Design a protein with these regions (language model features):
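Conserved, carboxylate-rich catalytic/transport cores that coordinate ions
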Residues: 33, 420-421, 517
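Flexible, low-complexity linker/tail segments at the boundary of structured domains
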Residues: 37, 521-522
């Protein structure tokens, strides 16, 4: 009612009401089906390796006798009236764990007859540019010491939430508890900064080449597109309209568009979108004692006040210096083995590192890199358990070399490349990918990850405050409470199995985490790098010699400590707890653990068991009993600790049915194991 006054949506959402579900008459459903499920509103989409003529003939034969309706009901879009003053909506939910603030700037949509032409592509290009630059500015704020929000973004998806008759330029943020006003003020000021001064040429250039890179990658992979991607595009075209020329034509047109649209045209568009009227402000958050929310009047007052605050033009400094300013003397490839397993080539380098190369033709525009070394988090003692909880999130927030994380992101504009370090229980890992044209950059990032980690206390302070704010109300989510209960039931009070909580930051040390990173990643001994994809071995050799053969290597290789992995509870154990919910349901998890030899036969057997039980439960529990939307099954044999087995079966169901459904689940498992 608050967001859609004067519209049908003010009284009822498109999904309907619970009253209809609980009290409908069968004839009403039949009448609805007859009214709307009809040939002129339906489409059949088939994508795959099929005989087109045969499939078309089959479709015509099967559906030819479906009659066209006489005097069919007209499908109309629900209109959304304009508003002069900002509309305010505040909603609280007992199960919500985040406070989310939205500002919608409603606008008319591009008419359908234009949206299906090149005008629609131009509009989408400009919208993508605007959203990309705004998100980059929000990211800069997030890396400051104490940002008012946890996350923020801007977008325009041509719909005003559920309403397809209006579009809306949308700015949204996850606000920290107690900082709703400051979050709203920041969003408004950044929006006004764009309205008054627009985007800078350098911002536009970065966004432009990033968009072009995305289209270039899609074009290069045009022959490797999956069937479901085509289906999604056709469904979207049928339901929402627009253009669908194919990636070849779209890529050609977009290159022309990007070269001919100046930053001034982009600025004019976004400044027109940020209007003085047709504004809606939405606020949702936890219904929890102690959380104070502004009144609608106060929220409006904050918005209007922020809109009048003076703002300065956006300023930034962007470095174009080399990622690796001083290159080391290249190392050597001391041994080459060709024709290895799966047709791979294996290099041994002068520093002892091994490199596995496997050229493939599955994707033209992608090279995948993984690197692992034995060791892992289990080599750290009890005093570092809390540090380990955030280790993978924290070790790269400072950036690399001479670049902060935000500066590095800007420096990599227009490149399809990524590289990330992580620590698992028994290994150190480096994962990355690149387009063949950006392969050198991937090697530079690998080299910097080992040799030039960068600390940024301000970025860490931001991470800590945002993470603590996000964790503050996690327990309000019933599924988080269930996960906590399940973890305790399986692992007891083992601190290595507990999730991160706000109070853990009292024992977390950023300097210590960076020391831990150095302990595990400053020595590349034991690492095996594997590159798979569109590789030319002669072209990649110089990069291997320059960037991998020069990594520091002291010859020290360690193995993870399986004794530090939390052990599972022995024997039968049931943990049942109640939690009040607005929409009652029961979540059931059956967990079975054991031990078996870790080998390929047993791994395949476990996979087969999971797939068989998926089919059995779909038929018996979902289709026959109507007891759940689906039963999830996972079956795993762990390589570390070696041979530990876990079979987990979980489902949601009606409180009145859970015991009956769980009996079926357990009985069907027993029958499957017998056979």
């Amino acid at each position: 009612p608050k967001m859609y006054p004067g519209s049908r949506y003010a009284n009822r959402m498109p999904i309907g009401s619970i009253d209809v579900i609980e009290n409908f008459k069968p004839d009403e459903l039949r009448a609805y089906y007859k009214k709307w499920y009809r040939p002129d509103l339906q489409a059949i989409i088939i994508v795959g390796d099929v005989n087109v003529d045969q499939v078309e003939a089959t479709i015509k034969k099967m559906f030819a006798d479906v009659p066209a309706p006489v005097n069919p009901a007209k499908r109309e879009q629900v209109s959304v009236p304009d508003n002069d003053l900002p509309l305010i909506s505040i909603a609280k939910d007992k199960e919500a764990s985040n406070t989310i603030l939205y500002i919608f700037y409603k606008h008319d949509k591009l008419p359908n007859d234009l949206n299906r032409t090149i005008a629609g592509l131009v509009k989408d290009y400009i919208q993508q540019i605007c959203a990309s630059i705004m998100d980059e500015r929000f990211d800069d704020i997030l890396h400051q010491a104490n940002p008012p929000f946890i996350y923020a973004q801007a977008y325009d998806d041509d719909n005003f939430m559920i309403a397809k008759s209006k579009g809306a330029w949308t700015v949204a943020a996850l606000a920290k508890e107690g900082e709703i006003d400051s979050t709203l003020t920041t969003l408004v000021k950044e929006t006004q900064r764009v309205k008054q001064y627009g985007f800078t040429p350098s911002e536009y250039e970065r966004a432009r080449i990033n968009v072009l890179k995305q289209y270039e990658s899609a074009y290069n992979e045009r022959n490797n597109q999956k069937n479901d991607a085509y289906v999604r595009e056709y469904v979207n075209h049928f339901t929402n309209g627009g253009y669908i020329p194919g990636i070849e034509m779209e890529y050609t047109l977009l290159n022309q568009i990007a070269q001919n649209i100046p930053v001034e045209q982009v600025n004019q568009y976004i400044q027109d979108m940020i209007g003085e009227d047709n504004i809606v402000i939405g606020l949702t958050g936890p219904d929890k004692e102690g959380i104070k929310y502004p009144t609608e009047e106060n929220l409006l007052r904050t918005f209007l006040k922020a809109r009048q605050m003076p703002v300065e033009p956006y300023k930034e400094t962007v470095s174009n210096e080399p990622l690796v300013p001083t290159l080391p003397t290249p190392g050597r490839i001391t041994e080459t083995k060709t024709g290895q397993r799966f047709g791979a080539t294996v290099f041994t380098l002068s520093n002892g590192i091994k490199v596995v190369l496997k050229p493939t033709e599955f994707k033209k525009d992608e090279i995948i890199m993984t690197a692992t070394s034995p060791g892992g988090s289990t080599l750290f003692g009890t005093k570092d358990i809390d540090n380990l909880k955030v280790f993978n999130d924290v070790i790269e927030i400072g950036g690399l070399g001479n670049f902060s994380a935000t500066d590095l992101s800007k420096r990599l504009a227009g490149k399809k490349v990524s590289c990330a370090l992580s620590l698992s229980q028994d290994s150190e890992n480096v994962n990355g990918m690149a387009a063949p044209s950006d392969l050198r950059t991937l090697f530079e990032l690998i080299y910097l990850s080992f040799t030039a980690p960068r600390m940024d206390e301000e970025a860490y302070a931001s991470f800590e405050t945002r993470t603590k704010a996000q964790l503050q109300n996690m327990e309000l989510n019933p599924m988080v409470a269930f996960s906590d209960s399940l973890s305790k039931a399986v692992y007891g009070d083992n601190p290595r199995a507990s999730r991160l909580r706000p109070q853990d930051f009292e024992h977390i040390s950023y300097p210590r985490i960076m020391e831990m990173r150095k302990e595990r990643f400053s020595d590349a001994s034991g690492f095996v790098f594997t590159f798979v994809g569109n590789i030319q071995i002669d072209s990649i050799r110089p990069y291997i010699e320059q960037y991998l053969a020069t990594l520091p290597s002291q010859g020290k290789i360690e193995k993870g400590n399986p004794a530090e992995v939390p052990s599972t509870r022995k024997g039968d154990y049931m943990n049942r707890f109640n939690r009040s919910m607005e929409i009652p349901k029961v979540t059931v998890a059956n967990l079975y653990t054991g031990q078996m030899e870790y080998n390929l036969e047993n791994i395949i057997t476990a996979t087969a068991l999971k797939q068989v039980m998926d089919l059995v439960y779909y038929e018996k529990v979902r289709e026959k009993e109507g007891g759940t939307y689906g039963v999830g099954v996972s079956a795993r044999i762990s390589p570390f600790p070696e041979g530990r087995t876990t079979l987990q079966i979980f489902f949601d169901t009606d409180p009145a049915k859970w015991e009956q459904m769980n009996t079926i689940v357990r009985n069907e498992l027993k029958l499957s194991l017998i056979h």
